[in-house]
Structures are given as C-alpha cells and as structure tokens.
C-alpha cells in the first residue's frame, strides 16, 4: 500500500508504471477505487493516460476511457473485476453501462468466484458485495464454490454477508 500525502501537488504520470503488483487505485477526493488490470507492457501507457489535469491544475480521472478500455480487454475475468469495481464506485457511470456490467458479472459469476478463490482475494469478493452482485439467488452457490476451494476466509465473508443481508432478524435468546 502506498499512501501519498495530500500535500503532494504533482505526480509524474509514469510514477507507477513499473509497479507490477498494483491492483487498485483509490482516489480519496472522489471516494473511488478502481481495479488496475495486470498490464502487459504494451498496455501500460493506456492506464497512465487515464489521468489528466484541468485548467486549474486539478488531477482528474477519465472514467469514460476506463469504461471503454474495460469493454476492449480480452480476458473476461479481468473485465469482470474491472466491472465490479466500477459498480462499487459508479462515478460518472451511465445507467446502460451499469446494466451491461451487471449482466457481464452475472453471466460469468461462477468463473469469477473460482478466480477469486484461486487468488484468495477478499478485496475482489468484497467489491462484488459492495457492488450489489452478491444476491439471495446466488449466495448459496457462491458459498458452495468457496467451500469447495477450501477458502475459509472467503466462505466466512459470504456467510456474514448472507446473515447481514438475507436473513430475517429474529430475537436470539442465547447468552
């Protein structure tokens, strides 16, 4: 994790070009986190070109270009991860694109959950939950998939999510 102080006024657009393990960028001012796909060398410029400065010198992020990159990315699981983060933080996300992202994730949910298990990524599973893509219709299957992969942390997250979102609150007499 790299934390850049608010006092920093300028960062070179290539500052993180060689950060192979960079998975997520968080923009505190916008309240946004975006998934950064594993970049082949020839695509690194595309990600860094998403940043721009307005006339006042404020750094901004080009969400529209990010969304178009997402549509062009060849690996479906990376597209699903990018879509989950966009749904979790839908800054400047048109309704039609939101529906397309939800359909993409729903279509590839099983493969996506198995990929999350393979990488043991609670961050990606939480992104699905925060994006509203963990539904009452699919939660039991998702629990079965994470259990089959022997990922207790992920199964535990799903069980807690199920308890918080899909279980009716009944009075508990236990001590």
Language-model segments: residues:
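Structural signature of tandem-repeat unit edges
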Residues: 1-10, 20-37, 42-96, 102-119, ...
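Ankyrin-repeat C-terminal turn/loop position
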Residues: 132-134, 163
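Charge-dense, extended regions
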Residues: 153-175
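Conserved hydrophobic site in ankyrin repeats
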Residues: 125-128, 158
């Amino acid at each position: 994790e790299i934390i850049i102080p608010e006092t920093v006024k300028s960062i070179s657009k290539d500052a993180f070009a060689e950060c192979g393990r960079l998975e997520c960028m968080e923009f505190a001012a916008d309240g946004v986190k975006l998934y950064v796909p594993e970049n082949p060398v020839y695509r690194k410029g595309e990600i860094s070109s998403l940043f721009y400065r307005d006339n006042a010198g404020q750094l901004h992020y080009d969400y529209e270009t990010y969304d178009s990159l997402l549509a062009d990315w060849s690996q479906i699981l990376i597209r699903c991860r990018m879509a989950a983060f966009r749904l979790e933080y839908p800054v400047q996300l048109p309704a039609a694109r939101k529906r397309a992202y939800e359909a993409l994730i729903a279509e590839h949910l099983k493969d996506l959950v198995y990929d999350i298990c393979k990488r043991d990524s609670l961050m990606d599973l939480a992104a699905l939950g925060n994006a509203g893509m963990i539904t009452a219709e699919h939660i039991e299957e998702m629990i079965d998939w994470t259990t089959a992969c022997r990922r207790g942390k992920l199964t535990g997250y799903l069980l807690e999510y199920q308890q918080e979102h899909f279980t009716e609150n009944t009075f508990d007499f236990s001590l």
